[in-house]
Amino acid sequence: MYLPQEIIRKKRDNKELTTEEINFFIQGVAKETVSEGQIAAFAMAVYFNEMTMPERIALTCAMRDSGMVIDWSHMNFDGPIVDKHSTGGVGDVTSLMLGPMVAACGGYVPMISGRGLGHTGGTLDKLESIAGYNITPSNDVFGKVTKEAGVAIIGQTGDLAPADKRVYATRDVTATVDNISLITASILSKKLAAGLDSLVMDVKVGSGAFMPTYEASEELAKSIVAVANGAGTKTTALLTDMNQVLASTAGNALEVREAIRFLTGEYRNPRLYEVTMALCAEMLVIANLAKDEQDARAKLQTVLDNGKAAECFGKMVFGLGGPSDIIENYDNHLESAQIIKPVFADTTGFVHAMDTRDLGMAVVGMGGGRRVASDTIDYAVGLSDMIRLGQTADNQQPLAMIHARNEEQWQQAANAVKAAIVISEKQPEATPEVYRKIRPEDV
């Protein structure tokens, strides 16, 4: 028998907690015998003193086991259960192509996703822009769609990692969000509760990333790889670039359109293509669905070319309550904005830098994201035809097309877009799409 305050005192004094102490504390969080004040004190103690890898693994497992852990064994899947998690960015629509692409190559992708908060878009908000799509199906429907389509993207249910919900809500109001140990446990407790065989992490780097510096992003990626593997789930991470909007679009219905056009081959933004392929290839390799990256990329290109990946997306949407013809007639099922006009730079020159976070906030400002969790979303608004770093902006080449509800909203967004993009006489150095891969042996 332990006392919560003694566990807090021990961490406050920078001593290592045992697995039993961590389990006791987190069970108390889930059962609500540990108060919000005690959670806050614990989070602050961890914030200042960090946790060792064994502590992080124990915290992650305790939070994972605080609720239901999905067991897929009764489904008799004939392939591995794989998933991807991204730390979030702007125009980061990879999940919508990646799930179907991996499914078409023989993996099963039961993806439990989040909503957008702050400047980052949320996969669930994007999917909810499709009329009828149900992000909260029963467990039976979730399993059935995963089996039949190979992929199902849904929202987090209250039964998964309930301790994380309480800890996160407290961290959010006590300035303890940005701590590697707590972030690692929060991300992984939810992901590992989904009963995965393997996981690939996409950790963003740059002006639109969650972590402020390359070093911090790398540290988070290493922590996640070490902890997930320590908790028994084969995991690797890719550090990918978020110094510019990843896709050509940012906004909910706009990104769904881009994902469908990508899957059918109508249009594939080259940076989005490279990041999506790199993540998918890593998923196939660690799940033993491909020999190596080259083999994986060949398989992925095949399912894009023969339409199998697009078919998996269509099956998922229909299975979760959406229209049966989303691939063929997507424009019939996705909202469009009333005003669609280009915004031009005030000077001519190269696009030297972008404040990707501010571009994300421009979409939020139009109603395309949330400032607080209770906000409703306008699915139609956003940016499309985004200019890329190194391209020339002039009176022929706009910075973006702005999709707005009215003229006033368009003008505000236009000012925000111009302020977020730096035009210069000299061309910027090219940034890679993928900086590095972190495998278990690297940590």
Swiss-Prot record:
Its EC number is 2.4.2.4. InterPro entries: Glycosyl_Trfase_fam3, Glycosyl_Trfase_fam3_N_dom, Glycosyl_Trfase_fam3_N_dom_sf, Nuc_phospho_transferase, PYNP-like_C_sf, PYNP_C, Pyrmidine_PPas_bac/euk, Pyrmidine_PPase_CS. Pathway: Pyrimidine metabolism; dTMP biosynthesis via salvage pathway; dTMP from thymine: step 1/2. It is an enzyme of class 2 (transferase). One of its GO terms (cellular component) is cytosol. One of its GO terms (biological process) is thymidine metabolic process. GO terms for molecular function: 1,4-alpha-oligoglucan phosphorylase activity; thymidine phosphorylase activity. Belongs to the thymidine/pyrimidine-nucleoside phosphorylase family. This is Thymidine phosphorylase.
